[in-house]
From Swiss-Prot:
It comes from Parabacteroides distasonis (strain ATCC 8503 / DSM 20701 / CIP 104284 / JCM 5825 / NCTC 11152). Gene3D superfamilies: 3.30.60.80, 3.40.1360.10, 6.10.250.240, RecR Domain 1. SMART domains: TOPRIM (SM00493). The keyword Cell cycle does not apply. This is Recombination protein RecR.
Length: 208
């Protein structure tokens, strides 16, 4: 049975909220009614924060992490080891690794992983900019910290092949993260140890 709404404005709000990932129509209705119970100032601040996020957030021109300026705070920090680059799928992985407090290098955010089933190929990722960073000569080690899935392993292999002609060490995080797990869901201790105990990448790494 279709839900009937006493107001078209309420229905519109529910429709928009229900378009968010993981939010069903019942949850969307509950959120919309919650907003109605709050004062107008709260709702205005909430909406303004979302608009500012979409309009004003920038992407670091070096690593593609999100930031408020042209370069993110990690890349701009002279105390970080800029010769050590950790390659991750998305921004959530940067946040997860930073929370471990075990990594003092910098990052490179690919924006996804190779997934033919989803129509995502190497050209859809920020692999070329990673190659350019390595070609500049400052990078001494690349840590591949992608999800331990078939897609993650495929992406690792592609990057390894792209960087094979450069004088750079390529390592992969230890398999403390279970096969099929995504980096962002690993606990901080396990993830931190996986980075510390990383091993050199080779053609059999994805099968280990």
């Amino acid at each position: 049975m279709n839900q009937r709404y006493p107001s078209a404005l309420l229905e519109n709000a529910v429709n928009e909220l229900a378009s968010l990932p993981g939010v069903g129509r019942k949850t969307a209705l509950r959120l919309a009614l919650y907003m109605l119970r709050r004062d107008v100032g709260y709702t205005e601040n909430f909406a303004a924060a979302l608009v500012a996020l979409r309009r004003d957030v920038k992407y670091c021109k070096v690593c593609h992490n999100i930031c408020d300026d042209e370069v993110c705070s990690i890349c701009a920090n002279p105390s970080r080891d800029h010769s050590l680059v950790c390659v991750v799928e998305n921004i959530k992985e940067v946040m997860a690794i930073e929370n471990t407090g075990q990594f003092r290098g910098v990052y490179h955010v690919l924006g996804g992983i190779i997934s033919p089933m989803d129509g995502i190929g190497p050209g859809d990722l920020r692999i070329d900019s990673l190659v350019r960073r390595v070609a500049e000569g400052e990078v001494k080690e690349i840590i591949l910290a992608l999800s331990t899935t078939m897609e993650g392993d495929t992406t690792n292999f592609f990057i390894y092949r792209k960087l094979s002609g450069y004088d750079v060490r390529i390592s992969v995080i230890a398999r403390g993260v279970s096969i099929g797990d995504e980096i962002e869901y690993a606990d901080e201790i396990t993830l931190g140890r996986s980075i510390i105990n990383r091993t050199e990448f080779n053609l059999t790494s994805s099968n280990s």
